[in-house]
Amino acid sequence: MSHWDVIILGAGASGLMCSATAGYQDKSVLVIDHAPKAAAKIRISGGGKCNFSNMDVMPKHYICQNPHFVKSALSRYPSFAFVDLVERHGLAFETRELGKLFCLEKAS
């Protein structure tokens, strides 16, 4: 029987980000998903080019009953932090209209 420090259910954007964060902290991670391939929805977003973030992310663009939650969440992990992560992994991307960020290569 294997031992895992962290078990994550779901290989979508949040599950993969959570697994990467745990891995950076030297945790052994198991990600379980019902789909045969991880990140299925991410890979098809943006016509297969993966619209992975937006540089114009601001609290005023969100409709929410608790606007303080949005401010808090966005301040804890701003767009440029994810862009830094993408760049560290050598992924080429471009900025399109309205600040949308897309990978340059089609997802496989």
Predicted regions mapped to residue ranges:
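Short glycine- and Lys/Arg-enriched binding-loop motifs that mark or flank ligand-binding interfaces
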Residues: 6-11, 42-44, 95
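Gly/Ser/Thr-rich helix-start
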Residues: 11-16, 47-49, 91, 100
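Feature captures the FAD/FMN-dependent oxidoreductase FAD-binding
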Residues: 76-108
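Conserved active-site and cofactor/substrate-binding residues in soluble primary-metabolism enzymes
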Residues: 17, 37, 77, 81
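Conserved N-terminal glycine-rich FAD pyrophosphate-binding loop of Rossmann-like flavoproteins
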Residues: 21, 35-68
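Glycine-rich phosphate/pyrophosphate-binding loop regions near the starts of catalytic domains
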Residues: 62-64, 73-78
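N-terminal Rossmann-like FAD-binding beta1-loop-alpha1 element of flavoenzymes
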Residues: 4-31
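Short, contiguous strand/loop micro-motifs
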Residues: 5-6, 68-72
